[in-house]
C-alpha cells in the first residue's frame, strides 16, 4: 500500500476542488442556469380557487420553480381577492368552472390545488383524482362521510 504524502494529498484535493468550481451548477443540480426546473421536470398546476387563501397557497406551491400554474378555475375573476394571483401569473388560462378546466386542459395538468370554501372541496378533489391527478386540498375534504 502506498504511503500518501501530505503534499500529494493537497495537490490532488486542490485539483478536485478547482474542477468542481469549473463544473456548471446546472450539471450538478439538474437545474437550468437560472435556477429553474427544465420544462420536462416541472409540475403543471391546475388551480381550483384563486383568491383568498389561494393567494398564499399557489405562490408557496410554486415558489421553488418545480411547479407552475397553467390553469385557474374560479367563479369570480372580477373580485379583488384574485388580483394578486392574476398579476403574479399573467398568462394562465382562466375558467369559471373547474370541470371545464379539467376537461379542456386535463392532458396539460399534472396536479391540482383545491383552495375553495370547505363545502366545495370534495367535488373538485374527487374529479381531479379520478383523472389520475395529484391533488393538494385544504382540510376538511368534506363535512361528512355519509
PLM region descriptions:
Residues 138:
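The substrate-binding groove and active-site-proximal loops of carbohydrate-active enzymes
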Residues 141-146:
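Rossmann-fold NAD(P)-binding glycine/threonine-rich loop
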Residues 1-134:
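N-terminal glycine-/serine-/threonine-rich beta1-alpha1-beta2 phosphate-ribose binding loop
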Amino acid at each position: 500500500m502506498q504511503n500518501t504524502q501530505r503534499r500529494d494529498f493537497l495537490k490532488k484535493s486542490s485539483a478536485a476542488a478547482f474542477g468542481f468550481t469549473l463544473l456548471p451548477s446546472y450539471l450538478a443540480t439538474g437545474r437550468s442556469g437560472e435556477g429553474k426546473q427544465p420544462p420536462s421536470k416541472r409540475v403543471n398546476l391546475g388551480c381550483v380557487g384563486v383568491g383568498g387563501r389561494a393567494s398564499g397557497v399557489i405562490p408557496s406551491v410554486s415558489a421553488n420553480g418545480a411547479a407552475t400554474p397553467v390553469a385557474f378555475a374560479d367563479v369570480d375573476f372580477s373580485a379583488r381577492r384574485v388580483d394578486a394571483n392574476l398579476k403574479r401569473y399573467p398568462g394562465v388560462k382562466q375558467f369559471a368552472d373547474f370541470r371545464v378546466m379539467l376537461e379542456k386542459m386535463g392532458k396539460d395538468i399534472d396536479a391540482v390545488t383545491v383552495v375553495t370554501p370547505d363545502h366545495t372541496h370534495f367535488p373538485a378533489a374527487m374529479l381531479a383524482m379520478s383523472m389520475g391527478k395529484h391533488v393538494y386540498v385544504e382540510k376538511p375534504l368534506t363535512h361528512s362521510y355519509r
